[in-house]
C-alpha cells in the first residue's frame, strides 16, 4: 500500500510538472514573431506603418515618375503620417545595379524627391522629412535579373526612431 501511495504521489508530481511545462511553452517571451505581431497590431507604431501601410514604392527602369500603384501607396502613407504627425522620417531613393554610380545616385535622388513632393501635395509637412539617395549601393535583391532589378528601383519611407 505504501508503494501505491508513493507511486500515486509520483504520478501527481509528474502530471503537475508536465502541465507546467506545457503552460510555459505556450507563451515564449523570447519569440521574435510574438513581439513583431504585438508591435504590428499597435496603431501608430513603426511596425504598423510598414505592415499595414507600406513603406516603399517602386519605379520603372530609368524613371522617377510615380505610377498609379506608387501613388496609391503614398496616399496611404500620407494619411498615416498626417494622423501620426509626431514622426519625422527619411525618404531613401534607390536604383538598380545598371548604370554608373553617379547616374544612379542622381536617379535615386529624383525618386526620393518625387516621393517627397507627392507626400507634401497630400498635406504632409516638408519640415518632417529629409531625402537621401543611395543609388545602387544598398540593393535589397542581388542578382543579374529583372526580378532583382525591379525590387531595387524604389523609394523607402523610414520613420525616425522615437518619433520627431
Predicted region positions:
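Periplasmic peptidoglycan-binding/tethering modules of Gram-negative envelope proteins
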Residues: 26-88, 161-164
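Soluble non-cytosolic domains of exported or imported proteins
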Residues: 64-72, 98, 102, 106-110
Amino acid at each position: 500500500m505504501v508503494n501505491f501511495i508513493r507511486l500515486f504521489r509520483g504520478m501527481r508530481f509528474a502530471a503537475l510538472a508536465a502541465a507546467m511545462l506545457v503552460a510555459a511553452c505556450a507563451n515564449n517571451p523570447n519569440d521574435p514573431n510574438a513581439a513583431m505581431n504585438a508591435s504590428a497590431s499597435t496603431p501608430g507604431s513603426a511596425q504598423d506603418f510598414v505592415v499595414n501601410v507600406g513603406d516603399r514604392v517602386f519605379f520603372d527602369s530609368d524613371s522617377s515618375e510615380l505610377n498609379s500603384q506608387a501613388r496609391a501607396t503614398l496616399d496611404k502613407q500620407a494619411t498615416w503620417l498626417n494622423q501620426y504627425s509626431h514622426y519625422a522620417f527619411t525618404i531613401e531613393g534607390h536604383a538598380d545595379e545598371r548604370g554608373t554610380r553617379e547616374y544612379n545616385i542622381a536617379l535615386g535622388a529624383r525618386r526620393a524627391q518625387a516621393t517627397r513632393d507627392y507626400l507634401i501635395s497630400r498635406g504632409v509637412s516638408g519640415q518632417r522629412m529629409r531625402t537621401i539617395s543611395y543609388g545602387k549601393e544598398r540593393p535589397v535583391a542581388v542578382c543579374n535579373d529583372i526580378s532583382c532589378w525591379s525590387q531595387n528601383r524604389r523609394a523607402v519611407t523610414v520613420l525616425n526612431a522615437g518619433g520627431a
